[in-house]
C-alpha cells in the first residue's frame, strides 16, 4: 500500500490524498452508531465510535483490520457538530482505528435512513497478497 502525495502538496492531517494498493478488496456497507441489539449510542462522538467499531467487526469477518482500509466516506447529519468537535473525533478515530489514515471524504446530509443515526461510514479495504 502506498500513500499518494503529489510533489509540493502539504501532508494532509488525518487522511490521505490517495492510496495505491494491490490485493483482495473488502467493501463495507454504511455502518451507523448502533450496537448489535439495534440500540443507538448517545451523541455524535459515541455514534462515531460505535460506527467505527462496527466497521472493524465487519472487516474481521474478512480477515482484515483497520490497517487495511484504503477509503472511507463519512455521511454526517450535522457538519457544524463535526467541525466543532474535531479533536474528540480524532481521538475517537485513533482509539478504534489506530494511525491508519485512508483517503477520506466527509459529506453533509439532511438525514440518514435510520432517523436516529447521526453518522454513517462506508469503507473499502484492500488485503495485500
What is the role of each PLM region?
Residues 1-70, 76-129:
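N-terminal presequence-like segments and the immediate start of the first folded domain
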Amino acid at each position: 500500500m502506498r500513500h499518494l502525495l503529489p510533489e509540493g502538496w502539504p501532508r494532509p492531517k488525518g487522511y490521505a490524498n490517495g492510496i495505491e494498493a494491490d490485493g483482495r478488496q473488502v467493501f463495507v456497507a454504511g455502518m451507523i452508531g448502533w450496537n448489535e441489539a439495534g440500540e443507538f449510542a448517545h451523541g455524535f462522538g459515541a455514534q462515531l465510535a460505535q460506527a467505527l467499531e462496527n466497521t472493524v467487526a465487519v472487516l474481521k469477518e474478512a480477515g482484515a483490520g483497520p490497517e487495511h482500509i484504503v477509503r472511507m466516506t463519512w455521511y454526517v447529519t450535522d457538519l457544524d457538530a463535526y467541525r466543532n468537535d474535531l479533536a474528540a473525533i480524532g481521538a475517537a478515530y485513533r482509539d478504534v482505528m489506530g494511525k491508519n489514515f485512508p483517503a477520506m471524504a466527509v459529506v453533509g446530509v439532511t438525514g440518514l435512513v435510520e432517523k436516529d443515526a447521526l453518522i454513517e461510514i462506508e469503507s473499502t479495504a484492500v488485503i495485500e497478497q
